[in-house]
Structures are given as C-alpha cells and as structure tokens.
From Swiss-Prot:
Residues holding ATP: 118-125
Organism: Treponema pallidum (strain Nichols)
InterPro entries: AAA+_ATPase, ATP-dep_Clp_protease_ClpX, ATPase_AAA_core, Clp_ATPase_C, Clp_protease_ATP-bd_su_ClpX, ClpX_bact, P-loop_NTPase, Znf_CppX_C4
Name of the encoding gene: clpX
Annotated ranges, domain ClpX-type ZB: 1-53
Lineage of producing organism: Bacteria, Pseudomonadati, Spirochaetota, Spirochaetia, Spirochaetales
Record-given protein name: ATP-dependent Clp protease ATP-binding subunit ClpX
C-alpha cells in the first residue's frame, strides 16, 4: 500500500514486503516496487529472447529478389506489384535495422504503400505473404468500420490492438509488424473541397489515420473499445510499423483518363485511347492529384508515397490460381479428400468453367474457393460413409449444372 499523508510504511505491489533499511520502495501512479523486484525484472528482461526481427541484421534481411521469388510461390500474376512491394518491404526493414546507425545524420522516412486494384486481385494476399516471409506480426483492418474518435464505431487505435494481439501481446514485436488497411477508398471524402461539416467515417477517419501511419506513440486500450479516463493504456510506437493500404478505387481510371486526354469529350482519338488502355492508365499515369480528386486528403497521400496498381485477373490467371501455387485450392481439396481415401480429379474444362464463373460473378480470386466449396458439398457429405478406395471426377458438366438437384458430384468406379 502507498503512504498517503501520514507515516505509513510503504509496501511493494509485487512481493508485498514492507520498506526497511535494506528494501527501498519506488512509487508512482498507484503502484510501488522494491529494489529487489526491480533486479528480478531486469534479470527477466535480460534472459528474454528477442524477436527474430530484432536479431536480424541488414545482411540477413531477404533481398527484393528473394522476396519476389517467395511471392511467386503463392501469388499468380501481378508481377509489377510484386516487384514494388518487394523493394518497399526490403527498404522498410533495412531502415529499421539501420536506425541505430548514424548515417551522416540522415533520417530515413517510412515508405508506406498504397495498392490500387479490383476485388479479388490479390492485395491482401500479397501483404499477408510478405509478413510470413519476414516472420513479423500481421493485422488486417477494414477502413469502413472505423470512425472518428467520439462516434459510434471503431477507433483507429483498435487497428494497433489487433497487431499486438497477433504478436501474442509482445508490444516490441508488434512495433515491427505490418498492417493492411483494406477498403481505404471507401473513406474518401465526398468532394475534393475541405469539408465544413462532420464526415466521421470519411475525411474524419483519414485525419485520424494520419498520425499512426506516419509514426507516433499511440495509446491503445488493452481490451479494445473506447478510451476511458484513468484507464491503463498500451503505448505502441508506430514509427517502424509498415502500413499497406488497399482499395478498388472504382472510377479512378476515369479521373486519370480525363486528365491524360486532351480531348475527353467527343469522338476524338483520345477517347478511344482511354478505353483501349484501361488499367494501363492506372499503372503509368496515376498521380497524387488524381487521388485527391477521388477523395483522399493530400496529407494521407503524402504518407503513402509508394503507389502501385494491380491488374484485373484474367481467366488464365484464375485458372492458374486453382492449381499452381504451393497452397492452391485444388491441392488443398486433393489433400482433404485423400484423408477419406478419395482420389480427386479435375479435368481441364472444369477448371476453365470455374474460372469463368469467378469472372461472371466479378469476385476475382476471392470467389474461387466458394465456387469449389459448393461443388464439393455433396461429395464431402457422402465420402466419409463410403468404404474402400474412391475417385471423384469433376468435369465441366458438373460445374455448369451444379445447381440441378439431379446432378451427382461423386463418380464412382473401380480403382
């Protein structure tokens, strides 16, 4: 207990022993600790193993070539995005590893990333795969759930809490992690002019994100939710957290095209050029002013200096996603059915049909698994009850007629 105005003997909040000639007590903010407990805490911290990243020297950080090679094992296509992200991640962690070095007193600023691409193009997968290669904590946040402080919804600090939780409570490790903020385009302000009214889920959220993206010491409620007076807070330094923001930015290509073309209205050749180039405009010509016109505030654009546009996945890309990556969807289901002694076979036309369905549904790679799950439902229900070796063949007819009740997904024959 703490001494108030009287002469009460102080007690250590950790061991409970009283202050005497040999045991000295230090107090502050409602707690106290003795010199013996301080020594024990120091020993614990000395013996505690630092994270892999904390031990990683500049020479041990994977090079951009190594990072891209790792991405190639799990992500199909998006070659430009892989190269840009590999360089950005390498430079970021090289900066983190070298912060203790005084390089001509030059302060290297953080280069966060903005990914622009349609739904299902691989934005989240790219960020997650890189975090796995770097062996750092990773958290995903949905920008549409965030609101300005004081309004119903999530505070931006809750993003940091997710990262700390994914680091098993290790704040120091979380401070070297990666955060992916999805749907960043959905919090664009209503116009490029400064708002005179509250926009708590748009411009207000962008303003709230500024500090943590740039780098600050944020106070995070350990249990989540809103901050309360006298509440204990986690102090998280975001200076070394890499932020990757992503969004579809529907309509941005039109803004870019209008600026690039000298004659956007009428029947001139420039209009045809815009239609033919499509997403190529996003790769080559998008500038910060285009993003401002879309609705991002200039300050947040300045804190996302690395911008890259992802391609819409083609039918061939989607087909390759089904079979080529190390954790491809078809490989996963083959392993799953093998546990029930079932040999799973997809013919080439079936793979094409599944890819076409994903294109028709405009879900990209994200929709592939749900399509295959629906195809496999009856087979997964029946297979465990069937004894002996079995084979399941998925043909184009199965894919295109899977909604018909008369279609049987399991085709049996003697092995």
């Amino acid at each position: 207990m703490l001494r108030s105005k009287g002469d009460l003997v102080l007690g250590c909040s950790f061991c409970g022993k009283k202050e005497d000639e040999r045991r000295r007590i230090v107090t502050g903010h409602g707690v106290s600790i003795c010199n013996y407990c301080v020594e024990r805490c120091a020993e614990y911290l000395r013996d505690r193993k630092p994270s892999a990243l904390a031990l990683m020297t500049k020479e041990e950080i994977p090079t951009p070539l190594e990072l891209k090679a790792y991405l190639d094992q799990y992500v199909i296509g998006q070659d430009l995005a892989k190269r840009v992200l590999s360089v950005a991640v390498y430079n970021h962690y090289k900066r983190v590893a070298g912060r203790s070095l005084d390089i001509d007193s030059v302060l290297i600023e953080k280069s966060n990333v903005l990914l622009i691409g349609p739904t299902g193009s691989g934005k989240t997968l790219l960020a997650k795969t890189l975090s796995q290669k770097m062996k750092v904590p990773f958290a995903i946040a949905d920008a549409t759930t965030l609101t300005e402080a004081g309004y119903v919804g999530e505070d931006v600090e809750n993003i940091l809490l997710k990262l700390v939780q994914n680091a098993n409570g290790d704040v120091a490790l979380a401070e070297r992690g990666i955060i992916f903020i999805d749907e960043i385009d959905k919090i664009s302000r209503k116009s490029e002019n400064v708002s005179i009214t509250r926009d708590v889920s748009g411009e207000g959220v962008q303003q709230a994100l500024l500090k943590i993206i740039e780098g600050t010491i944020a106070s995070v409620p350990p249990q989540g939710g809103r901050k309360h007076p006298n509440q204990d807070m986690l102090r998280v330094d975001t200076s070394n957290i890499l932020f990757i923001c992503g969004g579809a930015f529907v309509g941005l290509d039109g803004i870019v095209g209008t600026r690039v073309c000298k004659n956007p209205v009428g029947f001139g050749a420039d209009v045809k050029t815009v239609k033919e180039r499509g997403l190529q405009l996003m790769h080559e010509d998008v500038i910060p002013d285009d993003l401002v016109k879309f609705g991002l505030i200039p300050e947040i654009i300045g804190r996302l200096p690395v911008t890259v546009a992802l391609d819409a996945l083609s039918k061939e890309d989607l087909r390759n996603i089904l079979v080529r990556p190390r954790n491809a969807i078809v490989r996963q289901f083959e392993a799953l059915f093998a546990l029930d002694d079932v040999r799973l076979v997809f013919d080439e036309d079936a793979l094409d049909a599944i890819a076409q369905q994903a294109i028709d549904q405009k879900t990209g790679a994200r929709g592939l698994r749900s399509i295959v799950e629906r195809l496999m439902l009856d087979a997964m229900f029946e297979a465990p009850s069937l004894k002996g070796k079995k084979e399941l063949c998925i043909t184009k007819k199965v894919v295109t007629q899977e909604e018909k009740a008369s279609v049987r997904l399991v085709s049996e024959r003697t092995a």
